[in-house]
Amino acid sequence: MKTPWKVLLGLLGVAALVTIITVPVVLLNKDEAAADSRRTYTLADYLKNTFRVKSYSLRWVSDSEYLYKQENNILLFNAEHGNSSIFLENSTFEIFGDSISDYSVSPDRLFVLLEYNYVKQWRHSYTASYSIYDLNKRQLITEEKIPNNTQWITWSQEGHKLAYVWKNDIYVKIEPHLPSHRITSTGKENVIFNGINDWVYEEEIFGAYSALWWSPNGTFLAYAQFNDTGVPLIEYSFYSDESLQYPKTVWIPYPKAGAVNPTVKFFIVNTDSLSSTTTTIPMQITAPASVTTGDHYLCDVAWVSEDRISLQWLRRIQNYSVMAICDYDKTTLVWNCPTTQEHIETSATGWCGRFRPAEPHFTSDGSSFYKIVSDKDGYKHICQFQKDRKPEQVCTFITKGAWEVISIEALTSDYLYYISNEYKEMPGGRNLYKIQLTDHTNKKCLSCDLNPERCQYYSVSLSKEAKYYQLGCRGPGLPLYTLHRSTDQKELRVLEDNSALDKMLQDVQMPSKKLDFIVLNETRFWYQMILPPHFDKSKKYPLLIDVYAGPCSQKADAAFRLNWATYLASTENIIVASFDGRGSGYQGDKIMHAINKRLGTLEVEDQIEAARQFLKMGFVDSKRVAIWGWSYGGYVTSMVLGSGSGVFKCGIAVAPVSRWEYYDSVYTERYMGLPTPEDNLDHYRNSTVMSRAENFKQVEYLLIHGTADDNVHFQQSAQISKALVDAGVDFQAMWYTDEDHGIASSTAHQHIYSHMSHFLQQCFSLR
């Protein structure tokens, strides 16, 4: 067994970062600690964002140039030399006042799309207004404007065609100043969705609002159509302004576990054949026969070339998926998807992929592709597939080991770039690697040794052909953004080092972060602790478990954060710990699939066991142990408190699930199967919070929910409240009027964290 790594964030400054091997953390003696007159990180600091972490959000526009917004000017940078020029003046944005929310440059750099009047809908979806700016004429285009309340808009990958969705129908502009061509006419609110996702596809499958995909040179536009006829509606009141005499009612087609699901169709239209005099009929591509035997999902779309596309389909029981590779026949003008180009992915122990099957990355000639799948030991690794599937053909794994590839970032003719957690055998780390395609033993970590104390958790943004890349070091030290050249990995320049924040934090007593593991049943389970300043292992501290614990989640990592836990540790001297038990991700399917078909069991037990293990470390006050979580974390919090373990004094559940039959079909059935007697109904019924109501008499409980939560409906907390009242349990509750799942409006955000802080102060007798 190798020595565990324990990561500390001293004062959070670059020079103060320390990586150690043994507990305790670096300590000051009692006199030095008492003499530390610096202020702490307060609740007001968190709520007002007093200390701002800077990032560097660039947008690549070629293999050697990127755009960056600075002082409201859009600057064009040369990656190699760092020189810049003004691409778009701030005066252009000033025309719209403060209403500009985003911009998008056409691939040929002739036009800029300006977004304003942004109105949020669900997690990813929104409506907005758009104007097109002509860069050659340096003026806005006033002809044939895009309608207000557009739901989605996107440039083609070459040139400057535009596709957009308005009132659930798709339109295409061949030229920005010319009239739009209407592609569909079947769109209907809450019923037929063309080119955009319905609620459940947006939230659980694509993680986006768009269901449009341009081909590489912009000839073809692919799109999905979702039909929610028959999908039951969730409805809730929206109270709005107090002058509204009757509340509004919001309706959303929302399939719950076992309910009628949306159906999906897939089409491709040739935009080069669009004209004002003839009608172009989109061509439909049907799902493979092996998934159309029952309910199924479209779960991935990827263009391979101008006349080849790959589609991934998934059965409703999400342990079987098929990738179909389809080719365009220029003679018959149809799309063919031969069974010899179908690739099947299955899971015998759980579900396909982490949340869905991973996307493929095709070689430039389209003859093969690389994809992250589980190897024979259950670890997610990169495998190479040939386009044409032969009987009994097995893909070739190019990575292997008891660690996981997180994502494929780029594929060139010579190398594949990916992020993994291999380094130091630390699941909560992230580093960038490249591997040679012709020699898989030629693998190199591009980030591991750059700044190993400050940087153990990286993200990357590569240029169009991966000639340059931006590394984003996100922890454990202050975030650092640098630009590199791929040929020799040379660092060309520092883009942002957060030195100003580093200087400010030198005057604040900041907590430290410890990342370590415990061994249970011969398996490593990782945890993190946010420890108070001047932590003294001979003292007893209150402990708050910060839990999520959903399938494929990870809370123990090497990332840097300034959040509520920073305040609790710095000012209130509370240890805030998170533990990744069974069901968590990035450590192999054995751990992740352990909770398959039994949510609310092992992941709940593991949080209780983690608290017991922390108590054994000697510095936790056994009479002051609490737990809190949001969403799935709220469910686990409630199940833990309702277990009657005697370990926890109090807890906070925000927007919790309470019964899995109340949650959406795609997420719930992925892990639980169907709520039918033939499948898994018994466990659906045995995993409710309400069934544990009697045990809440032993704990202090704060239940919180937003009344306009479109995701985890207020119904979930309402049923917990009803069960607790029926059981005669005294508890606290807080609702937030018209707030959704994030409870993120300015006033509600401040109120909820103030309220939760007061609850913990009372529970831990801190005031």
UniProtKB/Swiss-Prot annotation:
What does the UniProt keyword field contain?
A: Aminopeptidase, Cell adhesion, Cell junction, Cell membrane, Cell projection, Disulfide bond, Glycoprotein, Hydrolase, Membrane, Protease, Secreted, Serine protease, Signal-anchor, Transmembrane, Transmembrane helix
Q: List the disulfide bonds.
A: 326-337, 383-395, 445-448, 455-473, 650-763
Where does this protein come from, organism-wise? Rattus norvegicus
Subunit annotation: Monomer. Homodimer. Heterodimer with Seprase (FAP). Requires homodimerization for optimal dipeptidyl peptidase activity and T-cell costimulation. Found in a membrane raft complex, at least composed of BCL10, CARD11, DPP4 and IKBKB. Associates with collagen. Interacts with PTPRC; the interaction is enhanced in an interleukin-12-dependent manner in activated lymphocytes. Interacts (via extracellular domain) with ADA; does not inhibit its dipeptidyl peptidase activity. Interacts with CAV1 (via the N-terminus); the interaction is direct.
Q: What is the effect of changing residue 630 to E?
A: No effect on activity
Q: Which family does the record assign?
A: Belongs to the peptidase S9B family. DPPIV subfamily.
Question: Principal place where this protein is found?
Answer: membrane
> For this UniProt entry, which residues form the secretion signal?
none
Q: How does it sit in the membrane?
A: Single-pass type II membrane protein
Q: What is the annotated tissue distribution of the protein whose record heads this document?
A: Expressed in bile ducts and other epithelial brush borders (small intestine, kidney, colon, pancreatic duct); acinar structures in salivary glands; endothelial structures and T cell areas in thymus, spleen and lymph node.
Its job: Cell surface glycoprotein receptor involved in the costimulatory signal essential for T-cell receptor (TCR)-mediated T-cell activation. Acts as a positive regulator of T-cell coactivation, by binding at least ADA, CAV1, IGF2R, and PTPRC. Its binding to CAV1 and CARD11 induces T-cell proliferation and NF-kappa-B activation in a T-cell receptor/CD3-dependent manner. Its interaction with ADA also regulates lymphocyte-epithelial cell adhesion.
Q: How is its activity regulated?
A: Inhibited by GPC3 and diprotin A.
A GO term, aspect molecular function: aminopeptidase activity
Result for mutant: residue 633 to A: Reduced activity
InterPro entries named among the record's database cross-references: AB_hydrolase_fold (IPR029058), DPPIV_rep (IPR040522), Pept_S9_AS (IPR002471), Peptidase_S9_cat (IPR001375), Peptidase_S9B_N (IPR002469), Serine_Prot_S9B/DPPIV (IPR050278)
Q: List all topological domains (Cytoplasmic).
A: 1-6
The residue ranges for the Extracellular side of the membrane come to: 29-767
Result after altering residue 632 to F: No effect on activity
Q: What is the effect of changing residue 632 to L?
A: Reduced activity
Catalysed reaction equations from the record: Release of an N-terminal dipeptide, Xaa-Yaa-|-Zaa-, from a polypeptide, preferentially when Yaa is Pro, provided Zaa is neither Pro nor hydroxyproline
One GO term of the biological process aspect: behavioral fear response
* Localisation: Cell membrane; Apical cell membrane; Cell projection, Invadopodium membrane; Cell projection, Lamellipodium membrane
Q: What is this protein called?
A: Dipeptidyl peptidase 4
Q: Residues in the active site? A: 631 (charge relay system), 709 (charge relay system), 741 (charge relay system)
